[in-house]
């Protein structure tokens, strides 16, 4: 067994050798819980869900930790706007997170630490940084990390200090010695959550939370740290600096970064206002369509969210389920060369595009067996296909369930398309075409109602 993974730290694929043979300790940066999760977050969840499933299938004992940031400036701001406590807001969105996670078929982490549960460990790490002279107390009472004191700063993002811009998710403050210094502990402000510390009442900064939680649970160093590409700098860079300056030993062996989900060639993000929530996405597409789409590109590459790409995902899954339909269910007891080749693709930095191409080879082979009336061979290969599909969280329905749902989804898309065409005809005062399309919709059992708000429809 030889899995190769691209290490962002060394910028090359490496043969993965866990620190402890047969055991993998994995930490992935989780959510700041102040709003609904969007499908860009969903991509990162599903990518690392795939990594965990695959490593476990390959025989590794995986300890998967994903944190929750439940105290943060954004949480405090949103709670104030909503006139609720930060704790109540965070708890509400933690429940929503868990519901979305389940809806996406994402495996729950083995441990899910919350920042507020690890304040003593955070304070202990900050004290070590002060003792080692990597941190200082500013004039305003905040505690800052002294970036220029840490000589390896920039080794993950592969940039020199002089190239790095201040202000990129690093708060600007007159109390800093250097614009790149970042806050470890924030002095309490009136009405904000606070904890006692040697430096006065306050709360943790964002970056120090992950350093303290990951090392407290997994030890230091641990095997793999993952997250979205947008976290590489400054968040992950700062984690390395804090952890290695505080503990005086390496932090993480291997860094994995998931490519971003784009919409109209821009990163999907709340700041750009172009997000699609996980809940909205699941109203439009089945969970398996979403999972297939989000895993269809290599995890390190950007992926474009579009109706066309989602439709391609639906059609791909339809091919899988059509191949499985009508075959007897048999136990998956032995594997063929297909499984070996699947492992070969996935062992090469989780190359899902090649792995999916191989699954389609299996579909073609199943169909050939079926055409030649070799039903037993088709059924055996179908069982193997379902087993491999499980690594991606796919092929969990019966063929009848999925295909009936896909037909309904296709019908809805066709209805919406006809309504759009009718609205275009009405806008051009082409009443003949508009009436013809209305008749088509009536034949499909669809009643439409026009109003000043637009056209609504229902199936009769």
From Swiss-Prot:
Entry keyword annotation includes Secreted: no
GO biological process: cysteinyl-tRNA aminoacylation
One annotated Gene Ontology cellular component of this protein: cytoplasm
Catalytic reactions on record: tRNA(Cys) + L-cysteine + ATP = L-cysteinyl-tRNA(Cys) + AMP + diphosphate
MF GO annotations: ATP binding; cysteine-tRNA ligase activity; zinc ion binding
Main location: cytoplasm
Binding residues annotated for ATP, in chain numbering: 270
SUPFAM superfamilies registered for this protein in UniProt: Anticodon-binding domain of a subclass of class I aminoacyl-tRNA synthetases (SSF47323), Nucleotidylyl transferase (SSF52374)
Cofactor binding comment, as recorded: Binds 1 zinc ion per subunit.
EC number: 6.1.1.16
InterPro entries attached to this UniProt entry: Cys-tRNA-ligase, Cys-tRNA-synt_Ia_DALR, Cys-tRNA/MSH_ligase, CysS_C, Rossmann-like_a/b/a_fold, tRNA-synt_1_cat_dom, tRNAsynth_Ia_anticodon-bd
Cellular compartment(s): Cytoplasm
UniProt short sequence motif 'HIGH' region, positions renumbered to this chain: 31-41
Listed cofactors: Zn(2+)
UniProt keyword terms in alphabetical order: Aminoacyl-tRNA synthetase, ATP-binding, Cytoplasm, Ligase, Metal-binding, Nucleotide-binding, Protein biosynthesis, Zinc
Family named by the database record: Belongs to the class-I aminoacyl-tRNA synthetase family.
PANTHER family: CYSTEINE--TRNA LIGASE, CYTOPLASMIC, CYSTEINYL-TRNA SYNTHETASE
Subunit structure: Monomer.
NCBIfam families in alphabetical order: cysS
Protein name: Cysteine--tRNA ligase
Species assigned in the record: Coxiella burnetii (strain RSA 493 / Nine Mile phase I)
